[in-house]
């Protein structure tokens, strides 16, 4: 008899068929309590769980006593109580490598769009304001040869440093938990403490996961240390930034502009002051959102679950100790 799994994400037919070749699949729209109650027997017997964006917590796990592996279609997993999974010897799989280049493209796009005011001036053209040769009121600032500060030198940070160094001749500073020799050798990146990075960088790009240590790592003190000409980019997790402090820094001219792919609350409230600022480029968490990469992420998550339920967790496992 095939193992049974719960699927809470719509997959392309070919990937669904791949799952069905290995498992008995129960598809549900979400992991809300009423959904779990409606499919109580399927949840109780499921050995695998596959999807994204829903909360996976102790309350859910109590309804899934047979669960052995969970696979998220994402690199981040702050919506999952990893400690609770580990305590129950449930492995968590994620999709870190397949989205690296696409997210780095998004970060670079935010840097360019914000510095060159692409969104702002495009909207002015559409509004009929381009009636004569443009003057300084339409100008942005250069990106090439400016100093880039990367906070979080993981895979995405490395891909961003590559683009900045080779494509835009940007000096690269970085701050991370540990030195990254490859970044220093390949991109002449300079490791520094966070305060130094904030004081020297023209672009501060945050690519951090959300942890107890990184929550509100960026607040009023950090924005005050940045150049008034600095551009702040957040493509990690929204709660890494105190959004009220960011709004105040933008309103007070402490920093020049911001490009944001993530927010403290998502979707972003229509009442957010950020939406009324011409020096803010705000996009709806599109970091990995291309057709190609989202498909590859789903395929990776499917393969991860198949591997995990066969005892193969050599790659893409968040908590390998759970299998011990």
Swiss-Prot record:
GO MF terms held by the record: glyoxylate reductase (NADPH) activity; hydroxypyruvate reductase (NADH) activity; hydroxypyruvate reductase (NADPH) activity; NAD binding
Cited InterPro entries: D-isomer_2-hydroxyacid_DH (IPR050223), D-isomer_2_OHA_DH_cat_dom (IPR006139), D-isomer_DH_CS (IPR029753), D-isomer_DH_NAD-bd (IPR006140), Glyo/OHPyrv_Rdtase_B (IPR023756), NAD(P)-bd_dom_sf (IPR036291)
Gene this protein is translated from: ghrB
Protein EC: 1.1.1.79, 1.1.1.81
Keywords: Cytoplasm, NAD, NADP, Oxidoreductase
Complex formation: Homodimer.
Function, in words: Catalyzes the NADPH-dependent reduction of glyoxylate and hydroxypyruvate into glycolate and glycerate, respectively.
Residues annotated as the enzyme's active site: 237, 266, 285
EC class name: oxidoreductase
UniProt subcellular location: Cytoplasm
Protein name, entry field: Glyoxylate/hydroxypyruvate reductase B
Reactions mediated catalytically: glycolate + NADP(+) = glyoxylate + NADPH + H(+); (R)-glycerate + NAD(+) = 3-hydroxypyruvate + NADH + H(+); (R)-glycerate + NADP(+) = 3-hydroxypyruvate + NADPH + H(+)
GO CC annotation: cytosol; plasma membrane
UniProt xrefs under Pfam families: 2-Hacid_dh, 2-Hacid_dh_C
């Amino acid at each position: 008899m095939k193992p049974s799994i719960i699927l809470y994400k719509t997959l392309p037919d070919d990937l669904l068929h791949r799952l069905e070749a290995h498992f008995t699949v129960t598809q549900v729209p979400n992991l809300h309590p009423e959904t779990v109650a409606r499919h109580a027997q399927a949840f109780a017997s499921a050995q695998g769980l596959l999807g994204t964006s829903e909360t996976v917590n102790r309350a859910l796990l109590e309804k899934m006593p047979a669960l052995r592996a969970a696979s998220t279609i994402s690199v981040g997993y702050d919506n999952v109580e990893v400690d609770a999974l580990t305590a129950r010897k449930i492995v968590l799989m994620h999709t870190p490598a397949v989205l690296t280049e696409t997210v780095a493209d998004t970060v670079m796009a935010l840097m360019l769009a914000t510095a060159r005011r692409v969104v702002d001036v495009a909207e002015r053209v559409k509004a009929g304001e381009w009636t004569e040769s443009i003057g300084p009121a339409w100008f942005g600032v250069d990106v090439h040869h400016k100093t880039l500060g990367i906070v979080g030198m993981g895979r995405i940070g490395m891909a961003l440093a590559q683009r900045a160094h080779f494509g835009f001749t940007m000096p690269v500073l970085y701050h991370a938990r540990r030195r990254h020799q490859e970044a220093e050798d390949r991109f002449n990146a300079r490791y520094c403490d966070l305060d130094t990075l904030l004081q020297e960088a023209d672009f501060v790009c945050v690519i951090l996961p959300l942890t107890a240590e990184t929550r509100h790592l960026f607040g009023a003190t950090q924005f005050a240390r940045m150049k008034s000409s600095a551009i702040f980019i957040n493509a990690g997790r929204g709660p890494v930034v105190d959004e009220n402090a960011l709004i105040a820094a933008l309103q007070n001219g402490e920093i020049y502009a911001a490009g944001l792919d993530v927010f403290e609350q998502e979707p972003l409230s229509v009442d957010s002051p950020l939406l009324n600022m011409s020096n803010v480029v705000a996009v709806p968490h599109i970091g990995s959102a291309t057709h190609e990469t989202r498909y590859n992420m789903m395929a990776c998550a499917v393969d991860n679950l198949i591997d995990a339920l066969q005892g193969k967790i050599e790659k893409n496992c968040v908590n390998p100790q759970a299998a011990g």
